[in-house]
Design a protein with these regions (language model features):
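Extended, low-polarity transmembrane helix blocks
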Residues: 2-48, 53, 59-60, 64-75, ...
Length: 149
């Protein structure tokens, strides 16, 4: 009985490490991708158009004032992405990601249906579910949030 309990604890510890590694991978890829998109909007990095270029496009789809909204979206993506990636205030980072994706769905993708092949909501919807899933699960042991548990 004691050996069985020890084995069970060891297996649970291994499963926790694997789950935390999986959450770390998800957070890093999704969070840093969002941070990169924020840097595109704010600074024109990584092939982005900066606030003016992004603002012009936002105005063309009815989001005004374009430059201000580009800066706000860029800040939400940059800050939200970095928080999410680091696992620091993960729920706040996830909320910023979710808000940006909800706006993208409402203003760009909803009229095109579901599938990404027709510019539909598929991809932003998946990102919303990933962010929500991590927020509900927690950032895992390999996160800055874990330091405060």
């Amino acid at each position: 009985m004691l050996a069985e309990s020890f084995c069970r604890k060891k297996e649970l510890k291994r499963m926790s490490a694997l789950a935390s590694t999986g959450l770390l991978l998800i957070r890093l890829v999704v969070g840093l991708t969002f941070a990169g998109h924020g840097a595109q909007k704010l600074f024109g990095w990584f092939g982005g158009y900066g606030p003016k270029g992004t603002g012009g496009w936002l105005e063309s789809i009815g989001i005004r004032p374009g430059v201000t909204m580009a800066i706000l979206a860029g800040l939400a993506e940059l800050i939200g992405g970095l928080l999410f990636a680091a696992g620091l205030l993960t729920e706040v980072g996830a909320a910023l990601i979710i808000v940006v994706m909800l706006v993208a769905i409402a203003k760009v993708h909803a009229k095109h249906g579901y599938w990404v092949s027709s510019n539909g909501i598929e991809y932003p919807f998946v990102l919303i579910v990933v962010a929500l899933g991590v927020a509900l699960t927690g950032a895992g042991d390999y996160s800055l949030d874990a330091l405060w548990r």
